Structures are given as C-alpha cells and as structure tokens.
C-alpha cells in the first residue's frame, strides 16, 4: 500500500499513474537507452539526447537552452503529454500489472486533471488570492518540479559515459538485460 500511495503522489504534479507505470516501468526499464523504444530519450525535435536522433542546426546550442526547457516537463504532463501517452499506450495495449479498462483509465485521467486544476488554480482564487499571484505560484511550482525531475532523469541516463545500444537486424541486443542496465545507467 505504501508503494501505491507514494506512486499516487504523481497526481499532485498533474502526472498520471498509468502513464508513468508504462513509460517508466515497462518502456524505460525494459528498453533502457534504446533509441526508438525508451521514451525518456525522446524530447521531440528541440533536444537531441542520442546520436541516432535526427540532428538539426539549432542542436549545436542545446547545451545553452536545454536546461531552461527542462523546467517545462510537468507543464507538459498537465497539458498534453498524459493525453497523448494514454492514447498511444492503450492503442498498443500496454500495461503494468493487471490491465484496467480504457474507460476506467480515461475517467481517472479526466477526473484527476479536474481535481488538479481545482486544487492548484480554482481553490486559491476562491479563498481570495489574486489570480496573478496564483499563476505565478503555479508557474514557479511547476518549473521547479520540472527542472528537478529532468535533471535527475538526465543525470541517470544521458551523460557522456552511458551508451545507447541498438538491436541487430533480428531485433536482438548483444547483452543480457542486467548487463545492459549497467552499460546504460
């Protein structure tokens, strides 16, 4: 129950337990640092984490601008990421443990987002805090959380000495899962 409770705290930052379990426990820990499979390596076009990702001219400046974008991580959870991930994961029939019905998962996502907005935006305004102070506090909270989470994630998997192995033509990896974890972390 402790693990379930602690995992549920992701809702405080607008995350979703199902999405986190699939992205982190299934995709990331099964396919750690494998481009195209580990979603932690996919930051869209703006940041390039691996040599396999397409290179754009602006990537030569990413060491200067990426840290500012890291703070937007939990904003993305709140606004778009959870909806996109859930659609994608349900389409692929991915789950961690016993699979819940799509209707239950979508209902949970929508209700927790409504509760989230109610607690962090509506309630402070209702109790008399001016809207602009609420928005500043909301931004600072999210930016700080996003920055901390992103830096912790990147230090674990996207540093100079980690590797990004790719499967051979048959889709097989050259190392066992445990050895792969050591090389990629």
Residue ranges and their predicted role:
Residues 16, 78, 82, 90, ...:
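Transmembrane helix-loop junctions in multipass membrane proteins, especially transporters and channels
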Residues 11-12, 63-75, 100-152:
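Alpha-helical bilayer-embedded segments of polytopic membrane proteins, i.e.
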Residues 138-185:
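Membrane-interfacial segments at transmembrane helix termini in multi-pass membrane proteins
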Residues 1-98, 169-185:
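Membrane-embedded catalytic scaffold of the fatty acid hydroxylase/desaturase
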